[in-house]
């Protein structure tokens, strides 16, 4: 059928097609802009509630050397105390923070595994994973980031079972004079 059309008719057909394509693009852009404009601020914004503070005593740090994943650093956890509105006790000797340091990226992955014992004798297992980043932000300014997300395993039939059923965040508290590290634990509500 194209052979029957004159060259000027084919140009018109091409121009008409281009107009239709342009209209489709404009309509799609309008829908996209409208969809972005309709995105509302989420109503369920998580809140943080202070759960307790840990004062952790530490042993002598040692390195396992450079591994296939980075430099493995071990920091023994030798004890300490913790206290909050609904919980209080001691940190059991024998845990450790198994850090994986990547010096080229100024990044360290944390994985602390230890137990705590409440004042009424209940043992709770803790696994705290996090990140320390001591580099630069997107603008090239110095940036320090240290956050972790502890998970707790408390006896299901204890008054501490609430630790099993929530997410928690952990932040360091460098404002206190303490030989070791002070960590604040926050429950995500």
PLM features: what roles do these ranges have?
Residues 1-40:
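Bacterial Sec-dependent N-terminal signal peptides
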Residues 38-189:
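Beta-strand-enriched cores of mature, soluble protein domains
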């Amino acid at each position: 059928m194209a052979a029957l059309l004159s060259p000027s008719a084919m140009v018109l057909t091409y121009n008409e097609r281009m107009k239709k394509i342009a209209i489709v693009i404009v309509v799609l852009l309008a829908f996209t802009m409208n969809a972005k404009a309709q995105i509302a601020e989420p109503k369920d914004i998580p809140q943080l509630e202070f759960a307790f503070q840990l004062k952790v005593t530490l042993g002598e740090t040692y390195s396992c050397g450079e591994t296939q994943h980075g430099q493995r650093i071990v920091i023994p956890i030798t004890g300490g105390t913790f206290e909050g509105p609904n919980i209080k006790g001691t940190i059991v000797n024998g845990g450790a923070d198994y850090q994986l340091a990547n010096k080229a990226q100024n990044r360290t992955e944390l994985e602390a595994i230890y137990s705590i014992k409440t004042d009424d004798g209940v043992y709770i297992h803790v696994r705290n994973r996090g990140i320390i980043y001591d580099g630069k932000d997107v603008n090239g300014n110095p940036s320090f980031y240290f956050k972790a997300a502890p998970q707790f395993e408390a006896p299901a039939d204890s008054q501490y079972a609430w630790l099993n059923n929530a997410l928690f965040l952990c932040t360091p508290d460098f404002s206190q004079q303490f030989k070791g590290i002070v960590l604040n634990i926050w429950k995500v509500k």
